[in-house]
């Protein structure tokens, strides 16, 4: 990857999000852990997965809790159960949320790969 020419951190950050390859986007999909999970596992943040229970901390839906329905790697967004808006024609559409605006309160499935990540 070529380095951006700008010296401004905000432009460098935008460039990173726009040009990151799919296998590099895992780092951009981390969310903070709740105090209980942080104390239990000794980690501050971990990658969000489908099935995790999260609490939205910022934005229009702050305070809402629900399960992660989908993780969109291409757009670096997640969709949460119950976080929808109504379109003009009456259909419900899920609102994509950036993972940095949520807190993981409970893990969905803890398989072997995630166990290794938590035990590191």
UniProtKB/Swiss-Prot annotation:
GO terms for cellular component: large ribosomal subunit. CDD domains: KOW_RPL26. It holds the Pfam family Ribosomal_L26. It comes from the Archaea. Keywords: Ribonucleoprotein, Ribosomal protein, RNA-binding, rRNA-binding. One of its GO terms (biological process) is translation. InterPro entries: KOW, Rib_uL2_dom2, Ribosomal_uL24_CS, Ribosomal_uL24_euk/arc, Ribosomal_uL24_KOW, Translation_prot_SH3-like_sf. One of its GO terms (molecular function) is rRNA binding. The keyword Acyltransferase does not apply. Belongs to the universal ribosomal protein uL24 family. One of two assembly initiator proteins, it binds directly to the 5'-end of the 23S rRNA, where it nucleates assembly of the 50S subunit. PANTHER family: 60S RIBOSOMAL PROTEIN L26 FAMILY MEMBER (PTHR11143). NCBIfam families: rplX_A_E (TIGR01080). Part of the 50S ribosomal subunit. This is Large ribosomal subunit protein uL24. It comes from Archaeoglobus fulgidus (strain ATCC 49558 / DSM 4304 / JCM 9628 / NBRC 100126 / VC-16). The lineage of its organism: Archaea, Methanobacteriati, Methanobacteriota, Archaeoglobi, Archaeoglobales.
